[in-house]
Amino acid sequence: MKTEILQADDANIEKCAEYLRRGDIVAFPTETVYGLGASALDPKAAEKIFRAKGRPATNPLIIHVADKAQIETVAVVDDRSRKLIDALMPGPLTLVMPKKEVVPSIVTAGFDTV
């Protein structure tokens, strides 16, 4: 695996998006720590995260989303969650919600939530 350090400009963000589309992993800063990321919908990419971090398969992964609409693609959003999302996004927010079938079980460690 080749490691590259990239500046956060439009061209390199698109390059990282292409890495994610092809099933690779990327490191990125969050509000508090650096994270390793992969497509949450690709079970082989999720396996790469578990291997790279030495993470036990019983410990589910976090799914980061770009916006409110993307939440609907991976989770079932009830009225209470929608109120929190509408009040607090954009901005850092962590919610646990029922997962949609599109999310592979490896990502959720077999749990029904994401």
PLM features: residue spans?
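Active-site-adjacent structural elements in enzyme catalytic cores
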Residues: 1-114
